[in-house]
């Protein structure tokens, strides 16, 4: 598949809540550096830590104002640094999700493991968020599960090079 395959201009107005858990991973052999679009410079080897995961809940509602609002909480608390990263990420992927133009997002994310502990929390959080966004989109498309899985991997990687694992 190529990048163009993942662009969805379909739009809709609806509200709802989606939730995903994504496992983290820890690298045995790390990649060093990235190419364009978060593609790792070299191969790496990592282990999935299925009992260490990020839980992300996304509530989506038709937007209230002319600009989209994206609210982010980590562990139930506002976190300005993480919110800015999430906003930047969502702006970078909005061409792949037509519904982002007319919806506000309320995102709450938490890990069941310590943040900044050497476990790839950015990978699991981007994977969980990407999975939520693809699930929202799947409410209006007829994409099959195989396509949705590939899109989740593609969108996850744009947020973190390790997230598509």
Where is each model-derived feature located?
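ATP-binding N-lobe of GHMP and related small-molecule kinases
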Residues: 1-117, 131-145
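Short, electropositive, low-hydrophobicity segments enriched in small/polar residues
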Residues: 31, 126, 165
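Short helix-coil transition sites and intra-membrane helix breaks within transmembrane domains
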Residues: 117-123
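Short amphipathic alpha-helical face segments that pack within enzyme cores
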Residues: 124-132
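ATP-dependent small-molecule kinase catalytic core of the GHMP/sugar-kinase superfamily
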Residues: 143-165
């Amino acid at each position: 598949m190529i990048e163009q395959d993942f662009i969805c201009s379909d739009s809709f107005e609806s509200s709802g809540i989606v939730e995903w858990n994504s496992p983290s991973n820890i690298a045995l052999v790390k990649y060093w550096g990235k190419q364009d679009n978060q593609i790792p410079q070299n191969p790496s080897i990592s282990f999935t830590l299925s009992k260490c995961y990020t839980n992300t809940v996304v509530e989506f509602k038709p937007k209230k104002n002319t600009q989209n609002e994206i609210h982010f909480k980590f562990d139930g608390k506002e976190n300005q640094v993480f919110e800015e990263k999430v906003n930047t990420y969502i702006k970078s992927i909005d061409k792949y999700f037509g519904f982002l133009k007319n919806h506000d997002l309320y995102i709450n994310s938490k890990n069941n493991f310590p943040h900044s502990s050497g476990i790839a929390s950015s990978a699991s959080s981007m994977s969980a968020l990407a999975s939520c966004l693809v699930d929202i989109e799947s409410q209006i498309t007829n994409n099959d599960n195989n396509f949705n899985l590939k899109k989740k991997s593609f969108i996850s990687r744009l947020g973190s090079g390790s997230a598509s694992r």
